[in-house]
């Protein structure tokens, strides 16, 4: 099983759009506010090489392996990010 964690920031329209798309498609996810969890955000942004949101961490709960989806690196549009998430969840 895979867990979806959205790294988000208040006032980010792209973050809101992604969360709405996930809800509309019935994808369970948790949100980590980067202003509240700065140390978590530092690890994610350093790992991805991208310092802005939204970013998504896909964690395989069976072996704790993970994949980060970052804007401009893995997707240009929020809908493209949703496609990556849906594909990952089916694997």
Features from the language model and the residues they span:
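Noncatalytic linker/hinge segments flanking ATPase motor cores
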Residues: 14, 46-51, 71-78
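Short beta->alpha junction loops/turns
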Residues: 11, 34-37, 74
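Non-catalytic, surface beta->alpha helical segment in thiol-disulfide oxidoreductase systems
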Residues: 58-91
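Thioredoxin-like thiol-disulfide oxidoreductase module
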Residues: 34-52, 62, 84-89
């Amino acid at each position: 099983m895979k867990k979806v964690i959205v790294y988000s920031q208040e006032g980010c329209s792209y973050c809101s759009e992604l969360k709405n798309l996930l809800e509309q498609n019935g994808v369970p996810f948790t949100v980590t506010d980067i202003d509240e969890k700065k140390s978590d955000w530092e690890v994610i942004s350093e790992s991805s090489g991208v310092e802005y949101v939204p970013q998504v961490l896909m964690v395989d709960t069976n072996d704790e392996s993970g994949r980060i989806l970052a804007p401009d690196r893995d997707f240009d549009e929020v809908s493209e990010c949703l496609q990556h998430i849906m594909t990952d969840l089916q694997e």
